[in-house]
């Protein structure tokens, strides 16, 4: 029987958080018991330090809060929770939301447009999410809204703006930029060949380096079998930065399942 560390204190709490149920999403089933225990410890601290704010009638219960916290903490499992110090609130809409977008074109004209967003990450402010896309982040499909927005926060720790280069040693920056831009070019070539909808990697990754880092961070954790063989050099850089190897984790979990299946009597 697994002895979950957070269950030891359950008798002391009238409303124990449902961590074991929260861990049951496909994305987290490949984690070892030790990794799950460590992730829950981080997620507990996350919920103590951050404020989850439901908007427009969205109902936030304990299970939803736990799963949101677990996904926020997965990218920083080995980095530490201090890497998420750049915000204090998470705003959660029930569905994708409309925002006013303003930009300046090449000749200096300012344009305003209302656009639909799945999420936002403000450099000196909250992270904004929506529950429909959070739910779609539970599986291992290559899409993960929370990891995408967390990646932007990790990116901006390196300076004033998101550049696609997280906080790594200076001697690693040139190699990181080279491999990231090579990946962007490769994705763009595929888009030109088969179209955005048929591309094997989200076309948003080709839009700029910051989005490439965020999108590939989604694939790193939720579809490593697509990322690793296609961009092996960049994959190793991601492994070094995040201090995790989700592909090795996936293979180990599959091997364990196969062994268990062959020993069923």
Swiss-Prot record:
Essential cofactor(s): Zn(2+)
Keyword Zinc tagged: yes
Gene Ontology terms for molecular function: aminopeptidase activity; metallopeptidase activity; zinc ion binding
E.C. designation(s): 3.4.11.-
Subcellular location: Cytoplasm
GO terms under cellular component: cytosol
Pfam families linked to this entry: Peptidase_M90
Binding site for Zn(2+): 111, 148, 152, 211
Main location as per UniProt: cytoplasm
Top-level taxonomic group: Bacteria
CDD domains: Peptidase_M90_mtfA
Record's keyword annotation contains Transmembrane: no
Keywords: Aminopeptidase, Cytoplasm, Hydrolase, Metal-binding, Metalloprotease, Protease, Zinc
Cofactor stoichiometry and binding remark: Binds 1 zinc ion per subunit.
HAMAP family, sorted: MtfA
NCBIfam families associated with the record: PRK15410.1
Alphabetical list of PANTHER family matching this protein: MTFA PEPTIDASE, PROTEIN MTFA
Function recorded in the entry: Involved in the modulation of the activity of the glucose-phosphotransferase system (glucose-PTS). Interacts with the transcriptional repressor Mlc, preventing its interaction with DNA and leading to the modulation of expression of genes regulated by Mlc, including ptsG, which encodes the PTS system glucose-specific EIICB component. Shows zinc-dependent metallopeptidase activity.
Subunit structure comment from the entry: Interacts with Mlc.
Family that this chain belongs to: Belongs to the MtfA family.
Record protein name field: Mlc titration factor A
Organism: Shigella flexneri
Lineage: Bacteria, Pseudomonadati, Pseudomonadota, Gammaproteobacteria, Enterobacterales
Gene name of the record: mtfA
């Amino acid at each position: 029987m697994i002895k979950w560390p957070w269950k030891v204190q359950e008798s002391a709490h009238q409303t124990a958080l449902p961590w074991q149920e929260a861990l049951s999403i496909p994305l987290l089933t490949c984690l070892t018991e030790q990794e799950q225990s460590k992730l829950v410890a981080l997620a507990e601290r996350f919920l103590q330090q951050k404020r989850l704010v439901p908007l427009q009638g969205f109902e936030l219960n304990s299970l939803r809060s736990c799963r949101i916290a677990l996904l926020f903490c997965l990218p920083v499992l080995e980095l530490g929770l201090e890497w998420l110090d750049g915000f204090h609130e998470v705003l959660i809409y029930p569905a994708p939301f409309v925002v006013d977008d303003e930009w300046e074109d090449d000749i200096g004209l300012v344009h305003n447009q209302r656009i639909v967003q799945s999420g936002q990450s403000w450099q000196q402010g909250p992270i904004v999410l929506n529950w429909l896309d959070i739910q779609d982040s539970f599986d291992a499909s290559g899409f993960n809204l929370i990891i995408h927005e967390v990646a932007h926060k990790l990116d901006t720790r390196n300076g004033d703006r998101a550049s696609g280069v997280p906080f790594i040693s200076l001697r690693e920056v040139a190699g990181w930029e080279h491999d990231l831009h090579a990946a962007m070019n490769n994705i763009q070539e595929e888009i030109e060949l088969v179209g955005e909808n048929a591309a094997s990697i989200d076309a948003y990754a080709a839009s700029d380096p910051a989005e490439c880092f965020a999108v590939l961070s989604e694939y790193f954790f939720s579809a490593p079998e697509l990322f690793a063989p296609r961009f092996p050099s960049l994959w190793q850089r991601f492994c070094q930065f995040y201090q995790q190897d989700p592909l090795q984790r996936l293979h180990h979990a599959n091997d364990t399942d196969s062994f268990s299946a062959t020993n069923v009597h």
